[in-house]
Design a protein with these regions (language model features):
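Residue-level signal for well-ordered alpha-helical segments
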Residues: 18-22, 26, 34, 49, ...
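Non-catalytic accessory segments flanking enzyme active sites
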Residues: 24-25, 29-74, 78-79
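Rieske [2Fe-2S] iron-sulfur-binding domain
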Residues: 62-166, 170-173
Length: 174
């Protein structure tokens, strides 16, 4: 926004504050009730605002040091947000690649390993599958194919941002 436009708007706001008035639309605006109750509109808004853009899952201080984590499902995707052993912020779908079970049930904590409660598959805080019991039953598998699915994540402005789609991107310049 140009400085001249900012000044014009600020002068208008100051005028209303000085005169104890508010800005109105010049009359009553009627909004159809289905604006607030329509499932179709809800789905459109949900997809537009919460699935197409990065969302805040916490503040930087919510992961105070290396090997700390938090979990959330704020926007329909179970997220495991971690700081790795070097303190870098990363995020993964909090879902075991084997059977789709939630890997970490605790909301917050500090650990370097996360184990799926279903079969005990264990992941490090880099999302890698590092172990699985009963190898005689599962056979040899390519661990690289069964890690936690990483989600686009960045730490900026004091917040932890995660995109709910693995194919999404986070770009604050747009």
């Amino acid at each position: 926004m140009h400085k001249t436009e900012q000044m014009r708007l600020l002068k208008g706001l100051m005028h209303h504050l000085d005169n104890k008035t508010n800005i109105d639309a010049g009359g009553i605006i009627r909004t159809p009730a289905d604006t607030y109750t329509s499932e179709e509109r809800f789905d459109m808004e949900w997809n537009t605002f919460f699935q197409d853009y990065a969302q805040i899952v916490g503040m930087s201080g919510d992961l105070p040091g290396p090997n700390t984590f938090l979990t959330t499902e704020y926007f329909g995707v179970p997220v495991l947000a971690v700081r790795d052993s070097k303190g870098k912020f990363k995020a993964y779908a909090n879902v075991c690649a084997h059977r789709g079970v939630t890997v970490e049930a605790n909301k917050r904590g500090e650990k370097t390993r996360f184990s799926c409660p279903f079969h005990g598959w264990t992941f490090n805080n880099d999302g890698e599958l590092v172990g699985y019991p009963k190898k005689d039953q599962f056979g040899e598998i390519d661990k690289a194919c069964y890690g936690l699915k990483e989600l686009p994540a960045t730490e900026k402005f004091g917040f932890l941002w995660v995109h709910p789609s693995r194919n999404g991107s986070i770009n604050f310049d747009e």
